Amino acid sequence: MSETRFDLIVIGAGPGGYVAAIRAAQLGMSVACVEKRTTLGGTCLNVGCIPSKALLNASEHYADAAGGGLGELGIELGSVKLDLPKMMRGKDKIVDSLTTGIDFLFKKNKVTRLQGAARIDGAGKVTVTDGADAGSYEAERILIATGSHASSLPGIEIDEARIVSSTGAL
């Protein structure tokens, strides 16, 4: 990474962050976007809204086929089998397609992607750690778009075995 100074550094590449980064670049700003994941899109795209909806959609199709719901439409099926590993691969394919699309938009709009965890060290100063683009960066403006993460209830630990978060479920 040769460039270390930008008009704007966006911290977080979820739906708010990546859209803001792309729009700022379209308006003529030099923009970097820091994301701790190796893929863009944030929680929603990687382990939240999108993959859960993909699995829900597949599950609804299975339920219609297995439960005879298609019979009302004149469609009769023999035995119906659920292939969970294949369903998960389908979900992964959808997520990969969308994250690749955001990558393409970053390149098309000349948004610099910085992989790692961001820390604001002062006015206009951002340090990126724990990633491929670790280093010090400067910007006229910093936009924080870090999104959310799962929280547990007091006294109830998310162990991802018996009590799972949305991330663990996917």
Predicted regions and their residues:
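Beta1/beta-strand and adjacent pyrophosphate-binding region of the FAD-binding site
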Residues: 2-14
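Glycine-rich flavin
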Residues: 3-6, 22-170
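N-terminal Rossmann-fold NAD(P) dinucleotide-binding loop
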Residues: 17
